[in-house]
Amino acid sequence: MKLVLIRHGQSEWNKLNLFTGWHDVDLSQEGVVEAMTAGKRIKEAGLEFDVAFTSVLTRAIKTLNYVLEESDQMWVPVHKSWRLNERHYGALQGLNKQETAEKYGADQVQKWRRSYDTLPPLLEENDERQAKNDRRYQLLDTHAIPSGENLKVTLERVIPYWMDTIAPEIKEGRRVVIAAHGNSLRALVKFLEGISDDEIMDLEIPTGVPLVYELNADLKPVNKYYLDK
């Protein structure tokens, strides 16, 4: 069984080196090219899908659309869930990463970005950036909407969705592609591979490059590779 993971193509805020999180930004032109290239590589590799999953953020949705279009699979059913959203960067969202490092120190910012269990500064309740002000989250319990997340909290929302919704599809023999985000995919990869809390700090997933897992009957990876050429 194969599972394909794709981090969205470069976004406008990736290009500007800004913390993005749940803020909804579009793909950059380079990101569009990355997504289209991913779709072409998937087609060349002969990978076919029966069902697709993505977040409710534009950059991931558009990446999936380009991938399916370029691989001639636009008809594949797509399921969108906030549980596949990027990690919520709290009050860091919208800030420049370099300027934030100069203000708080590179070590502190690295902990906010990469540590498994260090929370970023949280959004204030009345901050206009609160996701509860966004119509796409209106049906969610307000207690489920974060004001900031570390990777541990991100994993705690991603893995139940994997276990309850995505994994059963794979066990039924359906071929799955997931287009999501750097940290929601890092959370899933940590779970699939059993990566330690310390080792996950060093894991980087490139934008727009399909990551193919070959899974056994227990959905444990037996092989993985990137479609990067």
Curated annotation (Swiss-Prot):
It is an enzyme of class 5 (isomerase). Keywords: Gluconeogenesis, Glycolysis, Isomerase. Its EC number is 5.4.2.11. Gene3D superfamilies: Phosphoglycerate mutase-like. The record marks H181 as: Transition state stabilizer. It catalyses: (2R)-2-phosphoglycerate = (2R)-3-phosphoglycerate. The keyword Isomerase applies. Disulfide bonds: none annotated. GO terms for biological process: gluconeogenesis; glycolytic process. The active site is at H8 (tele-phosphohistidine intermediate), E86 (proton donor/acceptor). Pathway: Carbohydrate degradation; glycolysis; pyruvate from D-glyceraldehyde 3-phosphate: step 3/5. Belongs to the phosphoglycerate mutase family. BPG-dependent PGAM subfamily. HAMAP family: PGAM_GpmA (MF_01039). NCBIfam families: pgm_1, PRK14115.1. Catalyzes the interconversion of 2-phosphoglycerate and 3-phosphoglycerate. This is 2,3-bisphosphoglycerate-dependent phosphoglycerate mutase.
